[in-house]
Amino acid sequence: MLVLNCSTKLLILEKMLKSCFPESLKVYGAVMNINRGNPFQKEVVLDSWPDFKAVITRRQREAETDNLDHYTNAYAVFYKDVRAYRQLLEECDVFNWDQVFQIQGLQSELYDVSKAVANSKQLNIKLTSFKAVHFSPVSSLPDTSFLKGPSPRLTYLSVANADLLNRTWSRGGNEQCLRYIANLISCFPSVCVRDEKGNPVSWSITDQFATMCHGYTLPEHRRKGYSRLVALTLARKLQSRGFPSQGNVLDDNTASISLLKSLHAEFLPCRFHRLILTPATFSGLPHL
């Protein structure tokens, strides 16, 4: 195991990962954030350098952590040789097996290999698989012709809005998610539409892997074109900063899939896999 701390080498790694799209997108997004101030306190672990076969991004060991916060305790994985990834999994100090955590990636063997090692350590593992999408370059000029009604007030979220997002996110509703969302809003780009009272009615945020997520419109404000406006604006904002505009969508989320198709988003050949690993000590907790 090698922790890559050199800023020059991290920039080189970023370029190397770009040549491995789309499977490397999650790790690439995390490395881009590391190279641009590292607001989420991440670090990179590899099997070797420069001819690596597996690379993992994780929370810095010195960063404050909550053992129940799998949102923040998230690892992104990319490998050229799955055996190298398994070897890193089996090393004692790459993953923190005493806490609830996530593993994210875009490669098909990720679940089976992770499950085999997790089972040997008596951890429960839960898989959720998504369609992975990528936005083509978005015009710098916003098109609002599709909006229905008055032009909305388009702005960004504040930490004060974290509670609303926590309550409306299917993955949320708990203290850990509330804190995580507040950190995402503080660290990364977001977009929202606000009503005449200044309250958010439609929004999307960016996560620690530079992925667009939690796109949501309050039910009473749907069918006005807000979701489309928010998605295009956030994609444009990410692209203007040099980030790929990527996202994930569940197979049964037909409304979001239809929206993405109307935006000409590219559905990638690989799928996004999110694994949540839970030690037996915490297995009875309801929000996990």
UniProtKB/Swiss-Prot annotation:
GO molecular function terms noted in the UniProt entry: glycine N-acyltransferase activity
Coiled coil: none
Reactions accelerated catalytically: an acyl-CoA + glycine = an N-acylglycine + CoA + H(+); (9Z)-octadecenoyl-CoA + glycine = N-(9Z-octadecenoyl)glycine + CoA + H(+); hexadecanoyl-CoA + glycine = N-hexadecanoylglycine + CoA + H(+)
Enzyme class: transferase
Pfam family, any one: Gly_acyl_tr_N
Claim: ATP-binding is one of the keywords in the record: no
EC number(s) reported in the record: 2.3.1.13
One GO cellular component, as annotated: mitochondrion
Keyword annotations: Acyltransferase, Lipid metabolism, Transferase
Any one Gene Ontology BP term: lipid metabolic process
InterPro entries the UniProt entry points to: Acyl_CoA_acyltransferase, Glycine_N-acyltransferase, Glycine_N-acyltransferase_C, Glycine_N-acyltransferase_N
Pathway entry: Lipid metabolism
Recorded family membership: Belongs to the glycine N-acyltransferase family.
Function comment: Catalyzes the conjugation of long-chain fatty acyl-CoA thioester and glycine to produce long-chain N-(fatty acyl)glycine, an intermediate in the primary fatty acid amide biosynthetic pathway.
Protein known as: Glycine N-acyltransferase-like protein 3
Species of the source: Homo sapiens
Lineage: Eukaryota, Metazoa, Chordata, Craniata, Vertebrata
